[in-house]
Every structure is written in structure tokens, then in C-alpha cells.
Amino acid sequence: GECVVAGMGQERAHRAAQLLADRGARQLVSWGLAGALCPDLASGQLLCPAGVVDAQGRRYPVTTDLQAHCLEQVCLGAVTADLVTWHETLVEPEQKQALYRRTGARAVDMESVAIAQVARERNLEFVVLRVLFDPADRILPASILANTDPWGAVRLGGLVAALLRRPSDLLRLPGLARLARRSGQSLKAMADALPALNQDKNVDKEPNPL
């Protein structure tokens, strides 16, 4: 098995999935963070959805037996409701509510549909393993988002300048740090459980950057 770190966005995810398929992968796993669209979901919760939905409402179901195996071995108690892939980060609670009403999906990410499309084209098994980062009612600071690169690293110089222009965002940073710790702990716990999946499903958690 092999893991490719693709960065954020559908284009990067599609390239990574194609690369893995070209290298002989039999299963594709969409792994990372997601945002809540539904108010009953909390930061740090695990997601293993039954399907992913694109912006046009097309649904891509995951491989049922692979999902069941993940729910038993990797993410016991995970949320299994559908996830929607969107083209940008949703900053305001109103945006999240609108997408929830439009799609019925309970969570959102920026990559899974692209991976699902490659899995369908190449006849590969597919599953999603995600951790919720931001609750549906949480505002994400624009200064942070504008200065975060596709790999999730923050450009400190740009962030300082943005915070000087929007000092109110400073008040949101402690809460954002708590979300990062909570979701990071859940991601680590899920990663620690992956060897049980590797034994049967040939998934490797060692990253090879794209």
C-alpha cells in the first residue's frame, strides 16, 4: 500500500488518486479533515460516510464492505451520513446551513469526490475516513484561511499583516487552536488504528508527498 499527501482541493486530490491507481492501488482512501454542516456534529468526531456528493448533486457510494471493515477496525462509532465535496472553505455558519439544506449531506470537504471519480473510472474500492474540524456554528477567521497554503501550513508574515487589518480575528484564534488540538488527536487515534486495516486491506499510512 501507499499514501500520497495531495494537499487541499479537488485538482490535487484527482492527481494523487490517478497516481496511486497508476501504481497499482486496489483501494483509494480519502483521509483528512472535514467541516460540519449539521448542528449535531462536533469537532473531533470521526466520519466514514456511506457516500459522497458533488456540487451538482451526483452521489458516489463508497465500497460497502470496505466501509464496514473500517467501521469495525479503524473508526468505531463514526458518523456514516453522506459528505459533500465543495470547491471552497465555508467560512460562515449561514453558508454551511445553506449547503446542508441543498444537499442533505451532514459534512463537507474539498477532495473526496475527486478521489471517488477516479475510483469509479478505474474500478477501484473507495472509502472516506475523515475527522470533523469546525462545527456548523463556528466562524472561521478569514485572516487564517487567506494565509494557509494547500498543505495546511500558515504563512506567518501574511497572517500578521492580515491580523493587523482585522484585529477582531485575534479573538477567534484560541478557539481555533482548541479545534485543531481536538481534531488532531482524533486523526492520530485513527492513524494508530490503521495497522489493523493494513493487515487485510493493504493501506499504508507512511506519506509520500505528491
Which residues fall in each region the model found?
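Regulatory input/activation interfaces that engage signals or partners
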Residues: 132-200
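Active-site rim beta-loop-alpha module in soluble metabolic enzymes
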Residues: 64-141, 145
